[in-house]
């Protein structure tokens, strides 16, 4: 079979990671998820926590960072260093001679020009995501709602910082799936 790459991005709380893992298992391909963070942090020469903290700071300072030019702060330096390391890791892994699924980490944008690839976006209605989070993590409805909105905002800001695009837009997506449909999971 010819090598292929699938990137999967998603809304928080829609059980997309489980869908992505099942797809990778069914297809018998590599699955890259949170291990991308570890590899990128190592390559950037920063701790995993610093890498994740730099992403969180992107959310807190997104407007300032998007408008700034150059390295205005150590946070931005770490963010830029972390992003570059992550992009390099994703490209290095995609250049291997094996098929793979990349989950999140802006891989849809990073690999947009690679041959034989498909970008998938998984989503679900807010109510379904809240219900899933309540059942899976024993959260109250208001806690789950607040968490989903915060994480979605963070991911949107991070995606915008890295790509200049809006996460979830149809541009650069080949397939969008509502995972609330019971046959998907």
Cite the ranges covered by each PLM segment.
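A glycine- and Lys/Arg-enriched "phosphate-lid" helix/loop adjacent to the NTP-binding pocket
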Residues: 120-163
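ATP-dependent small-molecule kinase phosphotransfer cores
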Residues: 41-99
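Short, flexible turn/loop "capping" segments at secondary-structure junctions
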Residues: 111-112, 167-171
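Glycine-rich phosphate-binding P-loop
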Residues: 8-21
């Amino acid at each position: 079979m010819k090598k292929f790459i699938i990137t999967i991005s998603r809304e928080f709380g829609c059980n997309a990671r489980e869908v992505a893992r099942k797809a990778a298992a069914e297809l018998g391909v590599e699955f890259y998820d949170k291990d991308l963070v570890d590899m990128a942090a190592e390559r950037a020469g920063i701790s995993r926590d610093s890498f994740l903290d730099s992403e969180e700071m992107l959310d807190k300072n997104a407007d300032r960072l998007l408008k700034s030019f150059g390295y205005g702060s150590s946070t931005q330096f770490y963010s830029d260093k972390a992003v570059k390391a992550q992009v390099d890791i994703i490209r290095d892994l995609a250049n291997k001679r094996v098929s793979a699924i990349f989950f999140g980490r802006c891989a849809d944008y990073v690999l947009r020009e690679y041959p034989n690839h498909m970008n998938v976006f998984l989503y679900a209605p807010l109510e379904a995501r809240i219900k899933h989070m309540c059942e899976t993590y024993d959260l109250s409805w208001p806690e789950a709602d607040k968490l989903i909105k915060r994480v979605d905002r963070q991911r949107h800001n991070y995606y915008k910082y890295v790509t200049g695009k809006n996460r979830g837009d149809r541009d650069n997506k080949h397939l969008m799936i509502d995972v609330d449909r019971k046959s998907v999971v």
